[in-house]
Structure formats: structure tokens, C-alpha cells
Amino acid sequence: ALAGSDDHILAGIEKSAMDAALIKQSYTSDRTMEVVLESTLFGGFLQLVLPEEIKSIPTLQILDPPAVLEKKSSEYTGLIIDATAIEFYPVLYPVVISELGSEIYSALFISREIAVQQGVCRYVCAMDSVDTVRWVGENPISVKALRTGGPGNSSIVISRSDADIIEKTRERHRFMRECRVIILVSQTPNDQAQ
């Protein structure tokens, strides 16, 4: 519905399809051809489909008192949301809200440039990859998802106490701006297709 209503978006999606790699081509018994293409979601495609609310955010420099110039070991470096206990399926633009409905992670906190290049978050089934651990750093905040919400169940609801911890974390603006958020899911779409 979104692509059909905007010729610019439709043209961009068509260009992405033209640039995609052919993965599989087969013919069915009724003489139709089935084609599977593979393309990256990052870059131009995300630039087209991410909502306009995700804007460029200037880099904020958090100033520490002169005596404390080195990074504190207690400083949080990212956010991990465990959504394995709920039926949440990956979406391009997830929103995290508290039980009271306040937005904890949304367009307000995300830099468009970073989201376009790297995605709004990363979805994983296990925290065993070095890249995954590197993405959220050595000291991420970990929270559990309570349930889904919002249109199409594209929002994750977390507890008030977890939301309070995140909101009181000074460095959250830095790691959220950089989209250093991982959502742990029970299955990714690739796992479901197999």
C-alpha cells in the first residue's frame, strides 16, 4: 500500500529489484516462472521506506568533569531486548514502549544516516556471535519484552522498571542514536523459511 501510493518509492523499489542478485529461477507446472532475488535492505532501500520521523540527529558530545575523562566501566554501551518469550516478528522499524505507553526507542532517538547504513536494530536468535557482542559493546542494558503492541504488533512493550533504568541512563542517547540495539527473537524470517 505504501509503495503503490508514492511513485518515488515504487521507482526506488524497482531499481533495488533490478540491482538484486538472482538466487533461484524455476518454472512451475503451469508454465509460470518463479524467481528469487537477493538484495540488501541497507542504503537506498531503507532511505526510501524508513518513516520521515527518523531524522538526522547531530552528534552530541557528553561532557564529563575534567577529572573523569576516561570511559567509566559502568557506562552502558547498547541495549539488548529479549523478545524470545513473546510472538514478535522482525520489522524494519520496531518501536520499544513502556507499559505506560511512553516511547523508549523510536524515531526520536535514531539517526537517519546510521539507520539507513546499518538498520534500526539487529535481530538475532542467539548472543553467541562476536559481531553481535561487538555491536552492543561490553556493557549493554538487557531487558525482557512483556508483549507486543502497536499497529501490526510492531512495537515491543517492556516493564516500567526496565524503562526507568533506560531513561535514567545518560549515555542512552549515544547508543540509541547509533542504533546499537539488538532484539533477541526465537526465530528470524530466514529460519522460518527453511
Residue ranges and their predicted role:
Residues 1-194:
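Domain-level marker for long, solvent-exposed, non-transmembrane regions
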